[in-house]
């Protein structure tokens, strides 16, 4: 019985230890957080990657009429 179990374990070890092909690079999909399920906030919806993002706020130098600073 012991010899049978040891033989079975040896066969399993040989099958598991078989060489496996590996890649030398990481795919872009593994790095891109927006491509996976449940993307974080701020990711564009699928199909809009090439479009320019819409600005959230208009650009402002920090000057207003109240401050009387030079305006463009």
From Swiss-Prot:
One Gene Ontology cellular component annotation held by this UniProt entry: apoplast
Region feature (Disordered): 37-60
InterPro entries (alphabetical): RALF
Keywords: Disulfide bond, Hormone, Secreted, Signal
GO molecular function, one term: hormone activity
Disulphide-bridged cysteine pairs: 34-43, 63-69
Subcellular location field: Secreted
Signal peptide, first to last residue: 1-17
Main location, first listed in the record: secreted
Function: Cell signaling peptide that may regulate plant stress, growth, and development. Mediates a rapid alkalinization of extracellular space by mediating a transient increase in the cytoplasmic Ca(2+) concentration leading to a calcium-dependent signaling events through a cell surface receptor and a concomitant activation of some intracellular mitogen-activated protein kinases.
Family, as annotated: Belongs to the plant rapid alkalinization factor (RALF) family.
Protein name: Protein RALF-like 12
Lineage of source species: Eukaryota, Viridiplantae, Streptophyta, Embryophyta, Tracheophyta
């Amino acid at each position: 019985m012991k010899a049978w179990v040891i033989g079975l374990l040896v066969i399993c070890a040989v099958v598991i230890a078989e060489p496996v092909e590996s890649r030398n690079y990481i795919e872009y999909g593994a790095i891109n957080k927006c491509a996976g399920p449940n993307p974080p906030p701020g990711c564009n919806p699928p199909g809009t990657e090439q479009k320019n993002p819409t600005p959230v706020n208009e650009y402002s130098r920090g000057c207003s009429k109240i401050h009387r600073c030079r305006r463009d």
